[in-house]
Amino acid sequence: MKILWDEEAWRDLNSYLLNGDKKSYKKIISLIEDIDKNGVDKGIGKPEALKYNLSGMYSREINEKDRLVYKIDENGNLRILQCKTHYDKM
């Protein structure tokens, strides 16, 4: 599965490293590997299908306050949309 990063999500990922939060950075990598292995709605991080205006997207818990938000695009690629804050901030 090809992984595509939205610009905001890429900045989010790099901010964990810049701020010295290696634990959250490693968790994001683990979540992405798990999505590839187990699919979008199963596995670690409490996968959740989002609703309403976020329908078609999923989230997984990175830490207490941050969520990984992602979807599978029309070409079957995993698109990472956000790695910071909670999805209700989208």
Predicted regions and their residues:
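A short, surface-exposed loop/turn module that caps and links secondary-structure elements
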Residues: 33-61
